[in-house]
């Protein structure tokens, strides 16, 4: 099938960007979305044009490296998946797809669809860890923890820091990311001792990075 793309192109955060139109044909419905972009880039390179920059690594929805807006939706139309898990069977012949990077002050554009998410790293460095009794790792079953607690902690630990929550939030808040990291440590015995100081330190860093405030309005 034939797919029309409108992609945000920007050389860096210091220069203005613009949307550029591309056509990819043929596109197999069995391709992943990123494989379709690979095909586009192969064509651009063959024509001695600059390929579209985008992040990816595992391409299995695990690492959190990939991510951009697909028709204004973080990671695209399929719920609970990353953009690398999106497949072209989700689209139809002649569809026009608009691709943009995460839009947030705290995520400056590096190039095209690639943004700098190191602000997340600095939030973790501010307190997203345990520094108490970490000299020797105990056996996993040495500390008994209720299964329900473990499940809740694992749900929070499953956050892959992709940045989609920031992109989806009108205030560009990273409170969902920060709270996930706070929760997965605070729920477990190892993280109890520093839980209060951890929250304050991580939220202070969150605000210092320029993320917006969370709102329930």
Region spans (language model):
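Eukaryote-biased recognition of intrinsically disordered, low-complexity regulatory segments
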Residues: 1-23
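Short, contiguous acidic and Ser/Thr-rich linear segments
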Residues: 20-32
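Ferredoxin-type iron-sulfur electron-transfer modules in oxidoreductases and energy-metabolism complexes
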Residues: 31-50, 95-217
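Short, structured protein-protein interaction patches enriched in aromatics and acidic/basic residues
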Residues: 53-65
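Glycine-rich phosphate/adenylate-binding loop and adjacent beta-alpha elements
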Residues: 70-92, 99
């Amino acid at each position: 099938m034939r797919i029309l793309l409108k992609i945000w192109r920007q050389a860096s955060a210091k220069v203005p960007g613009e949307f550029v139109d591309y056509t990819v044909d043929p596109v197999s419905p069995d391709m992943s979305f990123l494989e379709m972009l690979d095909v586009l880039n192969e064509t651009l390179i063959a024509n001695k044009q600059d390929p579209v920059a985008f992040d990816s690594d595992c391409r299995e929805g695990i690492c959190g490296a990939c991510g951009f807006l697909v028709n204004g939706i973080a990671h695209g139309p399929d719920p609970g998946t990353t953009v690398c898990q999106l497949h072209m069977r989700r689209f139809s012949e002649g569809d026009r797809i608009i691709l943009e990077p995460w839009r947030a002050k705290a995520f400056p554009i590096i190039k095209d669809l690639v943004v700098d998410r190191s602000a997340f790293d600095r939030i973790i460095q501010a307190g997203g860890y345990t520094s108490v009794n970490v000299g020797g790792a105990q056996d996993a079953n040495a500390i008994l923890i209720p299964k329900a607690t473990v499940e809740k902690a694992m749900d929070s630990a499953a956050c892959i820091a992709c940045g989609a929550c920031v992109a989806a939030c009108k205030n560009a808040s990273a409170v969902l990311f920060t709270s996930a990291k706070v929760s997965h440590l605070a729920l477990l015995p190892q993280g109890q001792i520093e839980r209060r100081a951890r929250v304050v330190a991580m939220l202070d860093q969150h605000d210092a990075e320029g993320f917006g405030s969370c709102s329930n309005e």
